């Protein structure tokens, strides 16, 4: 049986990414052009700057991905791109480029939900795992628990009611005047600190549901800062990080037990956090659950996960309508 080739483009935020994937899950190329240096002086992503800088990078990245994969456009079986959610002006760059390619080549086109890409990314490493599973998506823009029944069949178990976990990391990093991006910097400093030095709130830890809240934790850090002096940064980073991760880990394990699921998966940019990976590994083992973590290179935004989600849908016969537009508020469930 012939193996399908998918070319996918991801431009939902500030990373320009192109990947070529061969079924069932062989990453032939995964090219990423980062804009971190461009946005560092602003302390965060500026949408107009992001979209303008996607434009000159798309074609060179497509060409680079094809060269690295040893493939030609004629060999591509399906073209895919992130449809949403994300920054509209950024989404439009990759989505329009992919639709144009699909039309020009006469190939099927699939618009992919960015969150579905994250959701399925732990499975990209293989081998297959039995479903259903409970997945924690934890990133700068989203924090949610989702039960995966099968490809395209998802149940939302809980989500943040205010800030996403990654957003809380970024905001606390700004309060501490840490370099951008703040999340990895907090992770680095926390490894040198005492996670029990400061008693910070674990909001909604015992709420009885699977929702999250991190804005109160951020506010607690803001009110604590004026009272501190000396060399407190590492301890505060460790204490803040521990508070976030305690809630993420405990609610994920409880959800798996509540719904009788034996497999837990974790994905999204914050899943690269070293403390989260350690504590989720330990908690899953203690609960007798199997754990699948997206590898760090597939945790942050990338086109390989978009290609994989597209491939899974392509093989089920799904095709997108070329008249569909990018949707910055696209829902997963």
Language model segments and positions:
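Short, acidic/small-residue loops that bind anionic groups at enzyme active sites
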Residues: 98-119, 288-293
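Short Gly/Thr/Asp-enriched flexible loops that form oxyanion-binding sites at enzyme active sites
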Residues: 81-105, 274-283
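Short glycine-rich phosphate-binding loop at a beta-alpha junction
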Residues: 72-83, 259-270, 292-295
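A short helix-loop
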Residues: 2-5, 11-12, 19, 29-30, ...
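Conserved phosphate-binding/catalytic loops in two-lobed NTP-binding clefts
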Residues: 111-112, 281-305, 320
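N-terminal beta-alpha supersecondary unit
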Residues: 4-85, 114, 118
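A contiguous, well-structured pocket-lining segment that forms one wall/lid of small-molecule binding clefts
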Residues: 72, 188-264, 274-287, 314
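Conserved phosphate-binding catalytic cores of ATP/NTP-utilizing and phosphoryl-transfer enzymes
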Residues: 1-3, 112-134, 309
């Amino acid at each position: 049986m012939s193996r399908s080739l998918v070319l996918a483009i991801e431009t939902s935020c500030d990373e320009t990414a192109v990947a070529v994937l061969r079924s069932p899950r062989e990453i032939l190329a995964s090219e990423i052009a980062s804009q971190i240096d461009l946005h560092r002086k602003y302390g965060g992503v500026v949408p107009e700057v992001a979209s303008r800088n996607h434009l000159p990078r798309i074609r060179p990245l497509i060409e680079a991905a094809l060269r690295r994969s040893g493939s030609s456009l004629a060999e591509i079986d399906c073209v895919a791109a992130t449809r949403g959610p994300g920054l509209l002006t950024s989404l439009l760059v990759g989505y329009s480029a992919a639709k144009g390619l699909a039309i020009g080549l006469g190939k099927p086109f699939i618009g992919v939900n960015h969150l579905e890409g994250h959701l399925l990314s732990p499975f990209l490493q293989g081998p297959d795992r039995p479903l259903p599973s409970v997945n924690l998506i934890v990133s700068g823009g989203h924090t949610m628990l989702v039960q995966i029944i099968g490809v395209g069949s998802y149940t939302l178990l809980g989500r943040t009611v205010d800030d996403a976990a990654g957003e809380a990391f970024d905001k606390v990093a700004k309060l501490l005047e840490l370099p951008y991006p703040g999340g990895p910097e907090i992770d680095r400093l926390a490894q040198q600190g005492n996670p029990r030095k400061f008693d910070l709130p674990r909001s909604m830890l015992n709420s009885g549901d699977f929702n999250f809240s991190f804005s109160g934790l951020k506010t607690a850090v803001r009110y604590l800062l004026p009272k501190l002096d000396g060399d407190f940064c590492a301890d505060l980073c460790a204490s803040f990080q521990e508070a976030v991760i305690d809630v993420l880990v405990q609610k994920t394990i409880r959800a798996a037990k509540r719904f009788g699921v034996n497999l837990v998966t974790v994905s999204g940019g914050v899943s690269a956090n070293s403390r989260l990976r350690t504590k989720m590994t330990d908690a899953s083992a203690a609960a007798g659950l199997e754990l699948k973590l997206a590898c760090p290179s597939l945790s942050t935004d990338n086109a390989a996960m978009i290609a994989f989600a597209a491939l899974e849908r392509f093989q089920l016969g799904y095709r997108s309508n070329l008249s569909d537009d990018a949707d910055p508020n696209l829902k997963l469930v």
